[in-house]
Curated annotation (Swiss-Prot):
A zinc finger (ZF-HD dimerization-type) spans 75-124. It comes from the Eukaryota. It is found in: Nucleus. Residues 134-143 have a biased composition (Pro residues). This is Zinc-finger homeodomain protein 1. It comes from Arabidopsis thaliana (Mouse-ear cress). SUPFAM superfamilies: Homeodomain-like. One of its GO terms (molecular function) is zinc ion binding. Pfam families: ZF-HD_dimer.
């Protein structure tokens, strides 16, 4: 009886060992399974259609993948006009857009370098150069000598001029001299200068007035100037300009009005008075 019990116990232990061995083999099978990328379907790991806008950085600029077609473009230098308030044009020098926040936030549309919106930066689209097919000319007939093709002149690539601060052109100061007015002719646009012409009487009266008031118009002479302008028909501004222009020429030269004849010398005393004075 004891021998049979021992055999039964041995059989049970062997069965338990076999079960443990099978469980270990199952664990090894789990570890030896293919990686997750092989188990999952390919459509779940790779997406060929992108909706919306995604951004990727690095590689010479901030790249944005837009739309389902996969068009990619980068945002380069900032083109915002910083001198628009003064009527000029100047940029801040930011050469590349760098987002100031995480994608999906408002700060992602703001540049961390210059603080401007992303729309102010130049959007650079990828350029794909497609070389046109080269058509070879047909071979020349026998006995025909072909001259070499002339070297075609290729103009140098146009270089964009540097950005400069464009200020509004200064307004041309108008001459306050009404004697020298200019008017454009109707056809050719050539300006012809007109000078105010004075009569001889007006010149004499202006010269006399100038010597009287000292070649300057002062406040105490307002009544005299106003009466003179009414009598002669010369505007006040024209008279003022005439005094300024002729002060150094006519003011120094002796006036013809002052060329008075010298008074005659006194007559000589008669000898009659001298004889009376003598004792």
């Amino acid at each position: 009886m004891e021998f049979e019990d021992n055999n039964n116990n041995n059989d049970e232990e062997q069965e338990e060992d076999m079960n443990l061995h099978e469980e270990e083999e199952d664990d090894d099978a789990v570890y030896d399974s293919p990686p997750l990328s092989r188990v999952l379907p390919k459509a779940s790991t790779e997406s060929h259609e992108t909706t919306g806008t995604t951004s990727t950085g690095g590689g010479g600029g901030f790249m944005v993948v837009h739309g389902g077609g996969g068009s990619r473009f980068r945002f380069r230098e900032c083109l915002k006009n910083q001198a628009v308030n003064i009527g000029g044009h100047a940029v801040d020098g930011c050469g590349e857009f760098m987002p100031a926040g995480i994608e999906g936030t408002i700060d992602a549309l703001k540049c961390a370098a210059c603080g401007c919106h992303r729309n102010f930066h130049r959007k650079e689209l990828p350029y794909f150069h497609h070389a046109p097919p080269q058509h070879q000319p047909p071979p020349p007939p026998p006995g025909f000598y072909r001259l070499p093709a002339p070297v075609s002149y290729r103009p140098p690539p146009s270089q964009a001029p540097p950005l400069q601060l464009a200020l509004p052109p200064p307004q041309r100061e108008r001459s306050e001299d009404p004697m020298e007015t200019s008017s454009a002719e109707a056809g050719g646009g050539i300006r012809k200068r007109h000078r105010t012409k004075f009569t001889a009487e007006q010149k004499e009266r202006m010269l006399a007035l100038a010597e009287r008031i000292g070649w300057r118009i002062q406040r105490q002479d307002d009544e005299v100037i106003q009466r003179f302008c009414q009598e002669t028909g010369v505007p006040r501004q024209v008279l003022k300009v005439w005094l300024h222009n002729n002060k150094h020429t006519l003011g120094k030269s002796p006036s013809p009005l002052h060329h008075h004849q010298a008074p005659p010398p006194p007559p000589p005393q008669s000898s009659f008075h001298h004889e009376q004075d003598q004792p």
